[in-house]
């Protein structure tokens, strides 16, 4: 039976385990693998979020930077504008170092740009739908703080609090909900990562370590949900064992989120005539994976296709209750 948790978001508590919660995805980005560019405009992003709420989303997750395979990520952008100005004023060498760093991460998204994308969407959604549970998908502490100030109640960090050294303290201070996701390496490194050995044991061990580190740093245990990060630094041959043995992650002692929506490993399984199924052709494969994950203990499913996921989750939940 799936364990029941009370997820403390600071402003309210969500019960996890009695039924599966559905987290709908809104990418305010030009380059996300599935829907990049579709919702970059503020009004389009808000309209999409409202559609997801109408379809039954329990949570809407809003992101302003893609972490698709091959994407450049910018942990350095997490440094606040004020602290950058201070360090730049201290010495010419700091200015030079900053210029070199900026050039190195020019393909990544700055905190300022990420905020420009997501903050108006979060603020307007909260104004129009004050009861909606909003999540911000970011690994930058400055973005997390501003987003929670605008109405987000959850910080969904794909790096598991590892890329921005201020993130753990920031989330502890904000007293919001948190999702710690597992990722091997950075997106630009994924194609060259060495084999992990037993991927399930690795993910379980590292997620547990990262969560316990966050607890020791002041993030209350009841605020944390763990995500094994399907597709994030995992090869085709590693995603299916992680799915098949998902129930083993329950030994971490934390509630679990699963995100397989439209992922490339599903597209490859559904390949036809030597070509992977495109993201828009992966719905039924996604639903099969989501149903299996719910039956193996997932508390939250993160998805682009909310209505379909809601219906699949109802059936999977009924099966769990019948055991």
Residue ranges of predicted features:
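N-terminal amphipathic alpha-helix/helix-capping segment at the start of soluble metabolic enzymes
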Residues: 1-27, 212-215, 219, 272, ...
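Active-site-adjacent loop and "lid" segments of alpha/beta metabolic enzymes
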Residues: 9, 34-51, 67-79, 105-128, ...
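N-terminal glycine-rich anion-binding loops that anchor highly charged ligand groups
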Residues: 16-24, 51-64
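Short, low-complexity, charge-dense intrinsically disordered segments
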Residues: 76-91, 96-99
């Amino acid at each position: 039976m799936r364990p029941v948790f009370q997820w403390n978001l600071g402003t309210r508590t969500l019960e996890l385990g009695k039924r599966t919660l559905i987290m709908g995805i809104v990418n305010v980005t030009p380059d996300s693998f599935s829907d990049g560019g579709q919702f970059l405009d503020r009004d389009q992003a808000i309209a999409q979020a409202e559609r997801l709420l109408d379809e039954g989303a329990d949570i809407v997750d809003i992101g302003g930077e893609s972490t698709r395979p091959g994407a450049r990520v910018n942990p350095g952008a997490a440094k606040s504008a004020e602290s950058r100005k201070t360090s730049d004023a201290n010495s010419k060498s700091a200015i030079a170092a900053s210029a070199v760093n900026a050039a190195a991460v020019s393909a990544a998204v700055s905190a300022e740009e990420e905020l420009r994308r997501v903050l108006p969407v979060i603020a307007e959604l909260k104004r129009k739908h004050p009861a909606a549970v909003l999540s911000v998908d970011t690994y930058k502490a400055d973005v997390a703080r501003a987003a929670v100030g605008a109405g987000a109640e959850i910080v969904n960090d794909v790096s598991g609090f590892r890329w921005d050294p201020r993130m753990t303290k920031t989330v502890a201070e904000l007293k919001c909900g948190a999702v710690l996701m597992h990722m091997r390496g950075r997106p630009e490194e994924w194609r060259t990562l060495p084999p992990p050995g037993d991927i399930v044991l690795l993910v379980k061990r590292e997620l547990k370590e990262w969560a316990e580190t966050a607890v020791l740093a002041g993030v209350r245990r009841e605020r944390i949900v763990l995500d094994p990060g399907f597709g994030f630094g995992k090869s085709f041959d590693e995603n299916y064992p992680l799915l098949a043995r998902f129930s083993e992650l329950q030994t971490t002692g934390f509630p679990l989120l699963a995100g397989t929506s439209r992922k490339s490993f599903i597209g490859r399984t559904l390949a036809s005539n030597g070509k992977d199924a495109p993201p828009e052709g992966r719905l039924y494969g996604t639903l099969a994976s989501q149903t299996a994950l719910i039956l193996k203990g997932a508390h939250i499913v993160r998805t682009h296709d909310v209505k379909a996921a809601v219906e699949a989750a109802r059936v999977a939940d009924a099966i769990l209750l019948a055991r």
